[in-house]
Each structure stands twice: as C-alpha cells, then as structure tokens.
Regions:
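Charge-rich amphipathic alpha-helical interaction elements
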Residues: 1-122
C-alpha cells in the first residue's frame, strides 16, 4: 500500500513537472514574440527617422540593421521553441496516460480489497 501511494505521488509529480515545462516554453515564446514585435516597431521608426527603408542601401541605419538581425534570431528561437512545445506536450500526454493507468489500477485494487473485506465480514 505504501509503495503504491509513493508511486502515485511520483506519477502526479511527473505530470505536473511536464505541465510546468510546457507553460515555461509557452511563456518564453510569448516573450520572444513580444520582443520581436517591439523590434519591428523600432525598425520602422528608425527607417522613418532616416528616410531610408531599403536594407540594401549603403546608408541604411546600422541600428535598424542590428535590430533586424536580432529580430530574425528571435524568430528562429520561436520556431525552435515551437518544436520543443510539441515535444513537451507529447511528453505531458504520455505522463498523463501513465498516471491514468496507475490510477485505474489503484481503483481496481481498492475495489478488490473492499470486496475481500466485505466477504471476510460475512
């Protein structure tokens, strides 16, 4: 009985840990997206300020060029994290299925114990 309770707690902890990981990655994606949007705004403002919007132009602002590079890096990171989210969600679903399996097993074992106890009383 004791080891079964410990095992159930372990499985619940694993499910929660997987859930936390998914939320953490989703939070990172949201933050990176916000930062990319801010950089887009800054790029537009810098291009307006200088009057040059062609990145191939020789006098294109260095700040805008650096902001574009940073934004592109953020977008690549977002793409990578999106893949990680899918993997983390799959791991969470797997852990949830395993927990459900152990919970149903525990329910069956408790039902058997109750049946044995009630039969012993008769």
């Amino acid at each position: 009985m004791k080891s079964r309770d410990t095992l159930m707690r372990l499985k619940r902890f694993q499910v929660e840990e997987k859930r936390r990981r998914v939320r953490q990655i989703e939070t990172m994606v949201a933050e990176f997206t916000r930062m990319a949007i801010d950089l887009d705004r800054e790029i537009v403002n810098e291009e307006r300020r200088t009057g040059i919007s062609d990145p191939a132009h020789f006098a294109y602002p260095t700040y805008a060029r650096a902001a574009i590079a940073r934004r592109d890096n953020l977008k690549r990171s977002i793409d990578d994290l999106t893949g990680q989210i899918e993997q983390a969600k799959a791991a969470e679903e797997e852990a949830q299925a395993e927990l459900a399996k152990y919970e149903s097993l525990e329910g069956r074992e408790k039902a058997i114990e109750r049946a044995v106890e009630s039969a012993a009383r008769l």
